[in-house]
Amino acid sequence: MEENNNIYPIFDRMLTRQDKEELLKQRGVMIWFTGLSGSGKSTIAIALERELHKRGLLCRILDGDNIRTGINNNLSFSETDRVENIRRIAEVSKLFIDTGIITIAAFISPNNDIREMAARIVGPDDFLEIFVSTPLAECEKRDVKGLYAKARRGEIKNFTGISAPFEAPEHPALSLDTSVLSLEESVNRLLEIVLPRVSRHE
């Protein structure tokens, strides 16, 4: 069978990341929130997106609600699928970042290996790891979805913080304890490190 030689690489004709960042007047970056369930990751992510939007900056939030029901709806919560879940999230995030979009991810991502994998895929220079360090006792007290109660009763297996471990990041760009900091304080601290990273200096 004759080999098809009619497929040619088109990367030399594609617009570059720089072209897109110049159009958007911003730099793409990954803001990766990690922490226990109920620590405040998604709440802070949403508030941060609103503040960046007010400043004319384009963002995209990725979290369990829009990932597990979409691109990763065929994955279980087995160890292998949890790793694949994060791998896919990182690959999708890289596409957004290469388009100049500020990408905000809020996932438990419970160990250093899995987060380091995400950072390698995205690229360490574009990866800001934010540890929402709210203590387990406070997360369990909030328990908005009743997940901790179910985990304590043994109804949920391998639940991070109860029956499965959580490894705190070794060198996060920022640590936020929402049992101490208000939402406004948390977002202000984030803006201090995020705005210099996403601003283009012409």
From Swiss-Prot:
Keywords: ATP-binding, Kinase, Nucleotide-binding, Phosphoprotein, Transferase. GO terms for biological process: hydrogen sulfide biosynthetic process; sulfate assimilation. NCBIfam families: apsK (TIGR00455), PRK03846.1 (NF003013). InterPro entries: APS_kinase, P-loop_NTPase. Pathway: Sulfur metabolism; hydrogen sulfide biosynthesis; sulfite from sulfate: step 2/3. Catalyzes the synthesis of activated sulfate. This is Adenylyl-sulfate kinase. One of its GO terms (molecular function) is ATP binding. Pfam families: APS_kinase. The keyword Kinase applies. The active site is at 109 (phosphoserine intermediate). The lineage of its organism: Bacteria, Pseudomonadati, Bacteroidota, Bacteroidia, Bacteroidales. It comes from Bacteroides fragilis (strain YCH46). Its EC number is 2.7.1.25. Belongs to the APS kinase family. It catalyses: adenosine 5'-phosphosulfate + ATP = 3'-phosphoadenylyl sulfate + ADP + H(+). Gene3D superfamilies: P-loop containing nucleotide triphosphate hydrolases. ATP binds at residues 35-42. CDD domains: APSK (cd02027). It is an enzyme of class 2 (transferase). The gene is cysC.
